[in-house]
Amino acid sequence: MEGFLGFNHNHCFIVLFFVSLSLAQYEHWPYLPGYPEPPPQVYQPPRRPADVPKIQLRLAGQKRKHNEGRVEVFYNGEWGTVCDDDFSIHAAHVICRELGYVEAVSWLPSSKYGKGEGKIWMDNVHCNGKEATLAACTSNGWGVTDCKHTEDVGVVCSEKRIPGFKFDNSLLNQIENMNIQVEDIRIRPILATYRKRVPVTEGYVEVKDEGTWKQICDKHWTMKNSRVVCGMFGFPSERKYNTKVYKMFASRRKQHYWAYSMDCTGNEAHISSCKLGNHLNVDTEKNATCDNGMPAVASCVPGRAFAPSSHSGFRKAFRQEQPLVRLKGGANTGEGRVEVLKNGEWGTVCDDNWNLVSASVVCRELGFGSAKEAITGARLGQGMGPIHLNEIDCTGFEKSLTDCKFNMESQGCNHEEDAAVRCNVPAMGFQNQLRLVGGRNPYEGRVEVLAERNGTLRWGTVCSQGWSTVEAMVVCRQLGLGFASHAFQETWYWHGDVSADSVVMSGVKCSGTEMSLAHCRHDGADVSCPRGGGRFGAGVSCSETAPDLVLNAELVEQTAYLEDRPMFMLQCAQEENCLASSAVNTSVTSGYRRLLRFSSQIHNNGQSDFRPKNGRHAWVWHDCHRHYHSMEVFTHYDLLNLNGTKVAEGHKASFCLEDTECEADVQKQYECANFGEQGITVGCWDVYRHDIDCQWIDITDVPPGDYLFQVVINPNYEVAESDYSNNVMKCRSRYDGQRIWMYNSVHNGANQDGDTEERFSAYWKLGNSILFSR
């Protein structure tokens, strides 16, 4: 790690780079704190016609992002809504620009953000998209409508704010609880110890207003305000700070204060949901003053994954000792499908009433900040098993999602409604240490890292020896580009910078959960790469989506049985190496093999289709199955003793991938017959029945006893998936020489129940595993 972040004081450009890493929170700024700011951009809004009344807008309701919500209009002293009749994206653009956003992304009819109250001010709204205000668009007239609040319209605005946007405060004295509208917000480190720390956790809270950064007076500042600000920057909680030190700093220079204070309740995910507080006094130079006060300071507590340690540094994504909540299927740190542990079994959360407040409880529980987005509709993949929680209602101050009010019944919910979150995470500056070069688009290219060599920081390649999809996943995550779709060990077709051809990183081995490639195991300064860099440098291609294969563990348990099969019926299987090595000594005419048979059903619960690694030209024809196999290693079936040693061999070696069955609204795309395209569609599953050739483990040589039965899907990570942790299924098995019992199946990482052995007596008399002979 040190080799990638070091610098030499003799090189000023290296010092600047180190500062930029230290102040990673400001990586998107055009300048660094302490340096002269560029002249503020002044936004010139379109002029409002004199005959058009002044209005104020806000986004309200059950938000899932801070920049979306039900459109509400303040007119004639009262808040009201807008009907969705004749509404268009042009009207949405006008609304978003009036609120300070660059443009609208979409609009939603039929009270998608909940029903409003009071007046419906506008109906049959028609805009051309260039109006200065929504009030300048045509409509039926103020309050003239035949709509109900079930038709309240909502909009989704771009996250980009208009540079230099000026907040119109002309109606401020008429409106109570007006929401905050600012261009941007930051925590600017003041003390030297925080200026050199990653992430930045303490400093002045500043807002960008009319293109200029301004401090906030602390006279009405509360810890609730700090909690909201800390949450926005990826921190789960706030803490007290040394006010005396900051007073000393504040007295040394003149401050430029924002004209308002903030009034947050503490459960907001973004300051745009907070209310404007008191209006400050304004001096003769048009600068707000903070009598006997100083700039407000926020001091934040980072989650464990982001708190630097002298021993481990920043390591893997945050994991609790005994987590009750986890995120699955997300591409980046701090995002994924929400799953909760109940009665020893992981289950999902239904998205009914899912909003930013509840999502923020999940994020803070896992050591992140507030929620950036409350995701609905299984957009980060569908889970399997039970749906544990529904209609969650959090106050925002709960320590865990399980402390919130919720409905235990999941009637009417299915996995197409699985809730997910995207959390605010601290800016660590990791993306500044890595780049992709030479690709056809920003999502692919040769991997180049910034490393210190001989006291100089320079770009270089990564040795491709042993480079796999797992390492590529870390690269894509570090750059914020989603999942890896491919890992490349040759990149001659991507021409990078010749000066960066030298290998600066070798021996890279990742677990897949790291936030940065530098956190993976590697050779450090002792680089060794016989192949060299250049054309053999490691490369990746990234994708915003990925498949996710999950085995139906219950079906394996239910269908397992033993069969004594004559050798003369196994000649084809022996040719495909589906039997144990001792089978060569078994008589073809009188011998038999004892087979543990079962069915497997492999679901694709991800966001994109699972396609084989090899193209059609590399598929292999199998006479026994009468079709082509696209993957030689797709699934491993193993019988292990209790210490994990493999005791049985001989199982299905290669596979054809197809859509055997699909959910009701999903159409099959892949089939093995007639040299068809192979793969598994999202929402479909591939079934390997217990009665097909090689769908077994040869246990002829296995003595009676207790064992572990294991199925591993995509064992070599040849194809990228959004979640590899659910690719392994294990279950306990007991074999008495004539019968076998399968029980207590779990996916990798899940906890087995403590009373398994006590319950085993109930399984002992089950008859679905009795020996069959042919």
Swiss-Prot record:
Give compartment(s): Secreted, Extracellular space, Extracellular matrix, Basement membrane; Nucleus; Chromosome; Endoplasmic reticulum
Keyword check for Nucleus, yes or no: yes
Give the catalytic activity. Answer: L-lysyl-[protein] + O2 + H2O = (S)-2-amino-6-oxohexanoyl-[protein] + H2O2 + NH4(+)
Q: Which UniProt keywords apply?
A: Basement membrane, Calcium, Chromatin regulator, Chromosome, Copper, Disulfide bond, Endoplasmic reticulum, Extracellular matrix, Glycoprotein, LTQ, Metal-binding, Nucleus, Oxidoreductase, Repeat, Repressor, Secreted, Signal, TPQ, Transcription, Transcription regulation
EC number of the protein? 1.4.3.13
Domain called SRCR: residue spans: 57-158, 187-301, 325-424, 434-543
User: What GO terms describe the biological role, i.e. biological process, of this protein?
Assistant: collagen fibril organization; endothelial cell migration; endothelial cell proliferation; epithelial to mesenchymal transition; heterochromatin organization; negative regulation of DNA-templated transcription; negative regulation of stem cell population maintenance; negative regulation of transcription by RNA polymerase II
**Entry's family note:** Belongs to the lysyl oxidase family.
What this protein is reported to do is described as:
Mediates the post-translational oxidative deamination of lysine residues on target proteins leading to the formation of deaminated lysine (allysine). Acts as a transcription corepressor and specifically mediates deamination of trimethylated 'Lys-4' of histone H3 (H3K4me3), a specific tag for epigenetic transcriptional activation. Shows no activity against histone H3 when it is trimethylated on 'Lys-9' (H3K9me3) or 'Lys-27' (H3K27me3) or when 'Lys-4' is monomethylated (H3K4me1) or dimethylated (H3K4me2).
State what protein this is by name.
Answer: Lysyl oxidase homolog 2
Protein's organism: Gallus gallus
Q: What is the lineage of its organism?
A: Eukaryota, Metazoa, Chordata, Craniata, Vertebrata
